């Protein structure tokens, strides 16, 4: 029959250079402590140059959190040998059960990563793991570091640039996505040209040459950054942002007209905001019937809505050439409508039309980036005060980056 030390030695599976020498079970603390020892006489190698070197001494005792044993917290302890390398100096050797400077075993980190990915919230995973927020953050930091090292960017052809409100007041982050891969590539604080420049640093010059198009809002800072880093890529102004601008114009007209009507005790537009902003197909039959009567009224809001609706057909054109003809006719109507919010958006689109017509060549948008919004907002609200940009970035890449997060030797 195996002794307890031999039993744990088989379960842990350390290489032959290490052995379990003692197992301490505390029923009161619900804790198992496993003491490992480097087998005397076993060769040691410098972790820097991998050369076999003489043993100098042993570092002070360290401990690592391991997978629980029958729901008992399990800790590995060891004094790790140090080598004396003529080239690299005195170095502590690597251990087979944990990464350098880690406080958790590879198996525990792999379990924690899988649990974080599967749990509905970081807090629930943290409670189950019986860890502090700081410890969970360190595990996520290390997982993202591993994932970024092995991430492949050679096949990225279509990139999205978008801004997200991610803090109090007017705090923003800039987010870069791989549109075809539906993943977040990088996050930078701010939404200016400097922030966008930081995002491009993840690519080599060879990888940048492979990027064909970039989807974004009509934000000049992002356009400038694209021109600097990927001058051969086409800018594609995102159709969903354009729709947002047109919606805002309709709403501005409605609010101004509603205020004017209410001064005359006319409540025609009261409570109608959603009717003007929703697509007809998303309205209930009752609401659609109400709206059919409303939009036939002699209202400025009706005209603004009609202009917005007409632009939706722009995206159904079969080519950029056909779309350009369509736009010129639409622009004559929109620019001459006498509704300042609509005219302002029409002029903005006219100014950027070349980067809008490019959609017909690439047909990309930031729809995937918009899909990450709910995840990013939930991460923001769940941080419980343990927030700074570095932590925010880690969490976004952890959950939205499609990275290989598991330790290599524990990923099976």
PLM regions with names:
Residues 1-33, 37-41, 107, 113-115, ...:
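Long C-terminal interaction/binding lobes of large macromolecular proteins
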Residues 1-90:
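Short, conserved DNA-binding cores of transcription-related domains
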Residues 10, 74, 93-95, 164, ...:
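Flexible, active-site-adjacent loop/turn segments at secondary-structure boundaries
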Residues 18, 64-67, 96-100, 133, ...:
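Tryptophan-centered motif/residue detector
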Residues 34, 125, 349:
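A residue-level signal for conserved active-site and pocket-lining positions in enzyme catalytic cores
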Residues 43, 48, 54, 168-171, ...:
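Acidic/histidine-rich catalytic cores and adjacent linkers
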Residues 50-170, 209, 356-357:
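Short, positively charged, Gly/Tyr-enriched micro-motifs
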Residues 248-267:
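Conserved phosphate-handling catalytic cores of large alpha/beta enzymes
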